[in-house]
UniProtKB/Swiss-Prot annotation:
Function in brief: ATP-dependent specificity component of the Clp protease. It directs the protease to specific substrates. Can perform chaperone functions in the absence of ClpP.
Biological source species: Rhodospirillum rubrum (strain ATCC 11170 / ATH 1.1.1 / DSM 467 / LMG 4362 / NCIMB 8255 / S1)
GO cellular component, as recorded: HslUV protease complex
Quaternary context: Component of the ClpX-ClpP complex. Forms a hexameric ring that, in the presence of ATP, binds to fourteen ClpP subunits assembled into a disk-like structure with a central cavity, resembling the structure of eukaryotic proteasomes.
Keyword hit for Cell wall biogenesis/degradation: no
Superkingdom as given in the UniProt entry: Bacteria
Protein name per its UniProtKB record: ATP-dependent Clp protease ATP-binding subunit ClpX
Record-listed Zn(2+) binding positions: C15, C18, C37, C40
Gene3D superfamilies in alphabetical order: 1.10.8.60, ClpX chaperone, C4-type zinc finger domain, P-loop containing nucleotide triphosphate hydrolases
Family from the record: Belongs to the ClpX chaperone family.
Name of the gene encoding the protein in the UniProt record: clpX
One Gene Ontology term from the biological process aspect of the record: cell division
Keyword Zinc included in the entry's annotation: yes
A Gene Ontology molecular function term of the record: ATP binding
Annotated positions binding ATP: P119, T120, G121, C122, G123, K124, T125, L126
Length: 422
């Protein structure tokens, strides 16, 4: 319906789709016989955009262009343009290698595995998860912290290939064209500078085990996982065409890079810039293979990851965008929770910037945003279900800083204000 009947609200207009009145939404667009609000328009755009995603990453010859892949990544991941470009080109080249695999050619295209390095909460895992949504090759994510050498308690490296097989419905042909993302790769660094001090089954041992499957080998994969079923037949999977992307925070790597870059100059020409003033992401841009060796990765493992991409720290503007822009942005999530209580939730611009600055101070990146939001809204979410007539809750900078309570706007206040203005 477009208009209500009877009473003082005789001339009030309503959205024909969701039923909200003109006072509950920012904009109401009129058609010949219907009305639609800005929220319904935004929802329709999200649905169309989601359906359009799969067609964006396919071109005429089946190989998506780097620009198409980047365009989709931009919808989900804020900032990190360099890392997104590296991933877009790598995935594009991976598709091209697969399209050339069956053709006779003098030149064999070798794969270029990727290493993503960046501070915690900057979007490494989100980039991988977004790729998984948009690609039409099998994709799996593995956690390096659970891996151990074969024969020890924990997961074998073959379990990574098993997950890829499961993602391809046990189609070996499709699994051999897949992409694997290994998270927390920095956690398998060598635990000691002396390689012979003791057997390192979850550090250097895992690096050694990963070498062959990353370069290309025929791996024997138990279809039921583990070694508990000795009678089962093993599946043979060729890993030559599987692209490996590794990611890690590499905490402390920035100190190794800074130490390498320090000179012993003194006097008037010396650089007296405080190394602490440089942000982690800025320091990581100068990473060299020798820094990774000092961190604890073995030379052979570093050699299997020729493409190196570093991610930047998220600045204030990027964190504000993360709060509001993506489809599943935090602010939208909490607004949906408040809508279930028939209440609108709104944040002032200064409040969003204050939340972003708090997250930067905590050095937890985007991951710190949720805990800050929970702290701000805890009392409100506790009290709201027992309150009646609350139409809107407004959060400003003072609320984020803990100097004030959120502003509650009641429906009777808004009605009286409308009457006064009339």
């Amino acid at each position: 319906m477009s208009k209500s009947s009877g009473g003082d609200s005789k001339n009030t207009l309503y959205c024909s789709f969701c039923g909200k009145s003109q006072h509950e939404v920012r904009k109401l667009i009129a058609g010949p016989t219907v009305f639609i609000c800005d929220e319904c328009v935004e929802l329709c755009m999200d649905i169309i955009r989601e359906e359009h995603k799969t067609s964006l990453v396919k071109s005429r010859d089946g190989v998506p262009s780097p620009k198409d892949i980047l365009k989709v990544l931009d919808d989900y991941v804020i900032g990190q343009q360099h890392a997104k470009k590296v991933l877009s080109v790598a995935v594009h080249n991976h598709y091209k290698r697969l399209s050339q695999a069956g053709k006779n050619s003098d030149v064999e295209l070798a794969k270029s595995n990727i290493l993503l390095i960046g501070p915690t909460g900057c979007g490494k895992t989100l980039l991988a998860q977004t790729l998984a949504r948009i690609l039409d090759v099998p994709f799996t994510m593995a956690d390096a912290t659970t891996l151990t050498e074969a024969g020890y308690v924990g997961e074998d490296v073959e379990n990574i290939i098993l997950k890829l097989l499961q993602a391809s419905d046990y189609n070996v042909e499709r699994a051999q064209r897949g992409i694997v993302y290994i998270d927390e790769i920095d956690k398998i660094s060598r635990k000691s500078d002396n390689p012979s001090i003791t057997r390192d089954v979850s550090g250097e041992g895992v690096q050694q085990a990963l070498l062959k499957i990353m370069e290309g080998t025929v791996a024997s994969v138990p279809p039921q996982g583990g070694r508990k079923h000795p009678q089962q037949e093993f599946l043979q999977v060729d890993t030559t065409n599987i692209l490996f992307i590794c990611g890690g925070a590499f905490a402390g790597l920035d100190r190794i890079i800074s130490a390498r870059g320090k000179g012993s100059s003194i006097g008037f020409g010396a650089d007296v810039r405080d190394p602490e003033a440089r942000r982690t992401g800025e320091v990581l841009r100068a990473v060299e293979p020798e820094d990774l060796l000092k961190y604890g990765l073995i030379p052979e493992f570093v050699g299997r990851l020729p493409v190196l991409a570093t991610l930047d720290d998220l600045d204030e503007d990027a964190l504000v965008d993360i709060l509001t822009t993506p489809k599943n942005a935090l602010v939208k999530q909490y607004q949906r929770l408040f809508e279930m209580e028939s209440t609108q939730l709104s944040f002032k611009e200064d409040a969003l910037r204050c939340i972003a600055l708090k997250a930067i101070a905590r050095k937890t990146g985007a991951r710190g945003l949720r805990s800050i939001m929970e702290g701000i809204l805890l009392d409100t979410m506790f009290d709201l279900p027992g309150m009646e007539g609350v139409e809107e809750v407004v959060v400003n900078k003072e609320v984020v800083e803990g100097r004030a309570k959120p502003l509650f706007i009641y429906s009777d206040q808004r009605t009286s204000a409308d009457g006064a203005s009339a």
